[in-house]
């Protein structure tokens, strides 16, 4: 197994040397990663959801808070390909991580604690059935606007895919609320499957379907399109006479993607952080595992920063000392544009219980900043352009001399990462010192700040929101100061 993986790594390094002659490079390392911690596997007692959004540059990420909205009768929603559906009377408030120009890269958390993100999981479907052009970009937005629970979100996704068909090559949507986590696997066209993550377990996905065994009689934990097995038989992807049980991932995933070590190695590395040595490195990995210890937000952050350090797969560039672009994708890599950990807690007002720990640029060399749902808006500078940048503009922004500019959050963090990545081996230690200090303070202040906000909330919600916003803004400004210190140090 390791010999085959290392052979691929060497091939990747050689390939990168060829394609690196022009800028930007081919997206070596391009691929998302997601985690769901079941409520009984978390320290909080509620679901934690996390995601690294990996897309090769040029990109920009905006963060916005969108208010609850009332809609007039007879209003319609138009889908990207031209399909239409009736608008609902009320759409819920949500936090929106937006990547302009990208159809499948946005993520959301709404006012009920329903969180949705996705991983590309290419399928072998090449004859998708679509109505009115199908649905793609708007699926996650509609879930955020309309669902009050994760199960409602899955049900809505099912209705949309059954009606329009899914207009993409395969994807896993991660849909969670404080009590449940689901993987909704859209194959393409009108075939899909969804599986619930066990409450006491942790599941990860890294760009390939992870649902294997399917219990069609268990509609509490599995939902599928009616002909999910029969369709596979009709396409000669599954033979029931073989004696082998129906394995969704084996049947529907693109075989090359499923056997790609850059995908299953990332899945394994995520699971090893959770379950330790009980999960051996293999192409065949469990859907979910029982953790050695219950996880909190800080433990999940550690997983999102993983680069195989401490394993035989860990490699670094001889030029920069970075684990990036060494031939095998890492969970945190140079294409990670934004990352988040969502604490989805009940037992208190959701304005306080929902916490969005977000990071701009690759988290292995960046900072997580907490934002409670109750904030009225993100700090100035967290949303700027509504368009995807050009190659030249992106290069100009990240290669310019570093300036800690609070009015341009994405460009400040991206520029910082560019400077660190060029001399990663010599600079990462000082980055980690600053990151640890700021994040430890953020976690230490978390509970006392929430206690103050809770006292205020029943009498003055605006004052409670200001308390939460001041906490977040203070952490944000401290990250800007830290980046300036790191790059100003001799």
Task: Enumerate the language-model features and the residues they cover.
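Short, well-structured alpha-helical segments that form the helix of a local strand-helix-strand
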Residues: 153-162, 300-307
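Bacterial N-terminal signal peptides
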Residues: 9-22
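Histidine-centered catalytic/metal-binding microenvironments
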Residues: 421-490
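Accessory, solvent-exposed terminal regions and/or long lumenal/extracellular loops of proteins
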Residues: 264-325, 329-334, 431, 438
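Positively charged n-region of N-terminal signal peptides that target proteins for export
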Residues: 1-8
């Amino acid at each position: 197994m390791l010999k085959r993986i290392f052979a691929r790594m060497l091939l990747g390094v050689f390939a990168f040397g060829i394609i690196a002659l022009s800028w930007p490079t081919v997206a070596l390392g391009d691929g998302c990663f997601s985690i769901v911690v079941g409520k009984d596997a978390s320290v909080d007692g509620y679901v934690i959801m996390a995601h690294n959004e990996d897309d090769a540059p040029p990109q920009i990420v905006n963060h916005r808070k969108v208010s609850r909205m009332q809609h007039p009768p007879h209003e319609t929603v138009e889908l990207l390909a031209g399909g239409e559906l009736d608008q609902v009377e009320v759409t819920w408030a949500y936090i929106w991580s937006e990547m302009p120009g990208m159809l499948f890269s946005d993520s959301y958390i709404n006012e009920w604690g329903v969180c949705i993100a996705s991983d590309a999981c290419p399928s072998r479907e090449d004859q998708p059935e679509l109505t009115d052009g199908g649905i793609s970009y708007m699926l996650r937005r509609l879930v955020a606007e309309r669902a009050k629970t994760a199960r409602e979100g899955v049900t809505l996704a099912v209705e949309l895919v059954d009606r329009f068909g899914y207009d993409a090559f395969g994807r896993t949507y991660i849909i969670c609320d404080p009590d449940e986590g689901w993987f909704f696997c859209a194959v393409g066209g009108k075939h899909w499957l969804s599986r619930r993550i066990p409450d006491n377990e942790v599941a990860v996905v890294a760009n390939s379907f992870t649902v294997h065994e399917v219990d069609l009689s268990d509609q509490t934990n599995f939902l599928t399109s009616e002909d999910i097995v029969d369709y596979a038989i009709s396409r000669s992807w599954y033979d029931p006479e073989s004696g082998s049980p129906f394995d969704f991932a084996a049947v529907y995933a693109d075989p090359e993607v499923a056997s790609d070590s850059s995908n299953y190695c990332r899945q394994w590395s995520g699971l090893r952080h959770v379950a330790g040595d009980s999960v051996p490195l293999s192409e065949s990995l469990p859907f979910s595992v029982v953790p050695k210890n219950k996880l909190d937000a800080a433990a999940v952050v550690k997983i999102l920063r993983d680069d195989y350090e401490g394993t035989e797969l860990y490699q670094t560039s001889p030029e920069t000392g970075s684990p990036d672009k060494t031939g095998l994708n890492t969970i945190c890599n140079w294409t990670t544009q934004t990352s988040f950990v969502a604490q989805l807690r009940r037992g208190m007002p959701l304005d306080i219980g929902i916490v969005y720990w977000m990071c701009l640029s690759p988290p292995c060399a960046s900072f997580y900043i907490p934002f409670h749902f109750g904030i009225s808006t993100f700090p100035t500078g967290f949303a700027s352009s509504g368009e995807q940048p050009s190659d030249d503009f992106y290069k100009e922004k990240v290669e310019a001399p570093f300036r800690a500019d609070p009015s341009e959050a994405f460009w400040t963090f991206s520029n910082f990462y560019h400077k660190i990545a060029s001399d990663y081996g010599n600079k990462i230690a000082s980055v980690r010192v600053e990151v640890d200090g700021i994040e430890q303070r953020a976690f230490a202040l978390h509970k006392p700040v929430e206690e103050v906000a809770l006292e205020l909330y029943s009498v003055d919600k605006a004052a409670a929101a200001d308390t939460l916003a001041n906490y977040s803004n203070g952490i944000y400004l401290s990250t800007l100061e830290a980046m300036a210190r790191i790059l100003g140090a001799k």
